[in-house]
């Protein structure tokens, strides 16, 4: 039985019925602290609660997102903490390991190769294994990889399900599709009537670019493409126009990457020379960079100045039949490599390494590296510094941490040396216990006078002990023969000053400054002083000219040449004769008072 319908209240005598027994309460004042609601307690993190953790582990996997779904939906992203150890054979550097994310890729020969040279990608028909960077690959086998074994190239098929729509066309593509031209095919008669679809026409379109295609070229070798070697004149003519302009390929910290090979061929399509400008880490080993440029591109480095390389394409280069490689669509994740800094490096104990690190804190750096600079002489400077000290430090303030770590790894292999620390943006290196000097004799920074220039007394020459001491204290000359000769001439002409060890130890900074100031004044006087030459124009007074000879004249009246008098060379005599002839010509050709300066002097004298 349904309930009875609600009855309306009876109207009051005053008129309408009062629906509210009492007036509604006032709205709460949000500014009054009495009416404010208390803040809700913070929500606890779900991952920190042990109950939620147990519930998450006990929960069965979702069938829609499990292993049975499409691999595209369960692919790891940038925030995924992925780390997979490589096979032991590849980690030990004894061989290669092939990794493939899909069985079909492995059957087609598409795989990720992990070996002693790092991470590379193998495609069928490719002349070599592709890498992200060819010149900056570490010389140590990786320990683990940070992403699944996916190839960074366009796949031959699209296994991913379609989840979007076709991309929008650009203005150029729309204009290209609208650009049609009517024509009649060659060899056929023109249609008499027009069909329902119109007359025959051809639509202009861009050739589809196959990003996964590998074309090794026309099969010619690198020597056949290069042709005959260039002469010096041809190299000069090719390089000169490219020195000033900035149409170039810039190589940075990643070195020669895979996609730069396509850029080099794009430069070669319009010009014979590709100018490559290198900065940063790759300039530490320019020889390695030039090798990979020639090996991977097929060109020839014909000129190099500092960090600028000029790459020649070859006499028989054809851009239509050049090799074509697929482009990398993204940068692969860098594998995990062994640590560069170890607590106890090779050949040292932990206590010895800690002591060297403490000594390195007070050591002055040999140089300061600039950001994106050119470091072509860094290896040579480090080797020279190891001749005088067992520890060397390089200041890398302002550089990217990955940059100076790569520089340290290169120095470890090229110098070679032992890396101790990267603290405070500085590279600290030890030359190693098995280090051997490049010179047979010890190094000194003070040039020594040769033995044949030092006078030896009879007692010293006859003493065997003195001879033994000389052989034992024989010091190698740091300077080259030409530079040593210049130093010797400078000391003899009082332009340079050499201090002995005793004088150096006795000098204080103030006395050294005073000594340098006094010597600078003396050297300037010697340098700017010239012998005076007296020329007498009065031939009627021969006594003035012969006054200096009267005292030395013998009684016979003939002049005898002195024993220590130097004879004048033929070249000097010819020069004097030439100067006398020039003076006679000037005196005979220009009369007195004919020059403009003579008029000025006369006017000044009159005033």
Swiss-Prot record:
The entry's keywords: Chloroplast, mRNA processing, mRNA splicing, Plastid, Repeat, Ribonucleoprotein, RNA-binding, Transit peptide
Which region ranges are annotated with the description CRS2 binding?
482-505
Instruction: Supply the SUPFAM superfamilies for this chain.
Output: YhbY-like (SSF75471)
Instruction: Tell me the GO molecular function terms.
Output: RNA binding
Where would I find the CRM domain in this sequence? 228-324, 346-442
Keyword Transit peptide annotated = yes
Q: Please cite one Gene Ontology biological process associated with this protein.
A: Group II intron splicing
Give the primary localization class: plastid
* Transit peptide segment: 1-79
Q: Where in the cell is it found?
A: Plastid, Chloroplast stroma
Domain of life of the source: Eukaryota
Q: Which GO terms describe its cellular component?
A: chloroplast stroma; ribonucleoprotein complex
Q: How does it assemble?
A: Interacts with CRS2 and RNA. Part of large ribonucleo-protein complexes that include group IIB introns, CRS2 and CAF2.
Job of this protein: Required for the splicing of group IIB introns in chloroplasts. Forms splicing particles with CRS2. Interacts with RNA and confers intron specificity of the splicing particles.
For this protein, the record's PANTHER family field holds: CRS2-ASSOCIATED FACTOR 1, CHLOROPLASTIC (PTHR46247), CRS2-ASSOCIATED FACTOR 2, CHLOROPLASTIC (PTHR46247:SF3)
Q: What is this protein called?
A: CRS2-associated factor 2, chloroplastic
């Amino acid at each position: 039985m349904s309930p009875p319908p609600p009855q309306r209240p009876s109207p009051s005598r005053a008129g309408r019925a009062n629906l509210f027994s009492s007036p509604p309460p006032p709205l709460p004042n949000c500014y009054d602290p009495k009416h404010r609601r208390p803040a809700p307690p913070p929500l606890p993190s779900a991952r920190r609660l042990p109950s939620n953790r147990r519930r998450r582990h006990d929960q069965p996997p979702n069938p829609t997102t499990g292993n049975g779904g499409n691999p595209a939906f369960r692919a790891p992203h940038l925030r995924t903490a992925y780390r997979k150890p490589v096979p032991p054979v590849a980690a030990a550097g004894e061989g290669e390991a092939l990794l493939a994310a899909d069985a079909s890729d492995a059957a087609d020969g598409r795989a990720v190769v992990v070996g002693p040279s790092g991470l590379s990608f193998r495609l069928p028909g490719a002349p070599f294994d592709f890498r992200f960077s060819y010149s900056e690959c570490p010389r140590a086998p990786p320990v683990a990889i940070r992403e699944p074994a996916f190839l960074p190239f366009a796949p031959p098929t699209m296994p991913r399900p379609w989840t979007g729509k076709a991309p929008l066309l650009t203005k150029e593509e729309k204009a290209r599709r609208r650009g049609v031209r009517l024509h009649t095919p060659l060899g056929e008669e023109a249609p008499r009537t027009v069909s329902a679809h119109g007359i025959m026409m051809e639509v202009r379109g861009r050739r589809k670019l196959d990003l996964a295609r590998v074309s090794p070229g026309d099969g010619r070798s690198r020597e056949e493409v290069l042709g005959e070697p260039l002469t010096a004149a041809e190299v000069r003519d090719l390089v000169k126009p490219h020195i000033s302009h900035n149409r170039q390929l810039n190589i940075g910290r990643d070195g020669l990457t895979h996609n730069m090979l396509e850029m080099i061929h794009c430069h070669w399509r319009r010009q014979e020379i590709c100018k490559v400008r290198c900065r940063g880490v790759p300039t530490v080993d320019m020889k390695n960079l030039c090798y990979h440029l020639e090996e991977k591109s097929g060109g020839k480095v014909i000129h190099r100045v500092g960090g600028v390389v000029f790459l020649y394409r070859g006499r028989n280069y054809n851009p239509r039949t050049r090799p074509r490689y697929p482009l990398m669509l993204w940068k692969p994740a860098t594998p995990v490599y062994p640590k560069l800094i170890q607590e106890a490096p090779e050949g040292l104990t932990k206590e010895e390494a800690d002591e060297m690190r403490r000594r390195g804190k007070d050591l002055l750096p040999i140089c300061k590296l600039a950001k994106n600079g050119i470091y072509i002489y860094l290896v040579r400077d480090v080797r020279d510094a190891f001749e005088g000290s067992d520890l060397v430090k390089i200041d890398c303030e302002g550089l990217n941490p990955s940059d100076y770590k790569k520089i340290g790894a290169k120095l470890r292999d090229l110098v070679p040396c032992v890396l101790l620390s990267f603290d405070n943006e500085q590279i600290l290196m030890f030359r190693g216990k098995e280090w051997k000097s490049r010179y047979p004799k010890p190094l000194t920074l003070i040039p020594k006078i040769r033995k044949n220039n030092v006078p030896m007394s009879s007692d010293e020459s006859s003493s065997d002990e003195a001879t033994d001491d000389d052989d034992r204290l024989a010091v190698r000359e740091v300077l080259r023969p030409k530079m040593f000769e210049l130093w010797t001439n400078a000391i003899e002409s009082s332009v340079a000053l050499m201090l002995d060890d005793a004088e150096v130890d006795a000098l204080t900074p103030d006395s050294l400054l005073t000594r340098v100031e006094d010597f600078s004044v003396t050297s300037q006087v010697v340098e700017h002083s010239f012998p005076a030459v007296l020329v007498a124009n009065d031939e009627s007074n021969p006594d003035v000219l012969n006054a200096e000879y009267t005292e030395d004249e013998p009684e016979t009246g003939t002049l005898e040449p002195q024993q220590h008098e130097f004879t004048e060379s033929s070249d000097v005599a010819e020069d004097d004769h030439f100067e006398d002839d020039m003076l006679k010509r000037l005196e005979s050709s220009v009369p007195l008072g004919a020059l403009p300066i003579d008029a000025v002097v006369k006017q000044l004298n009159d005033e």
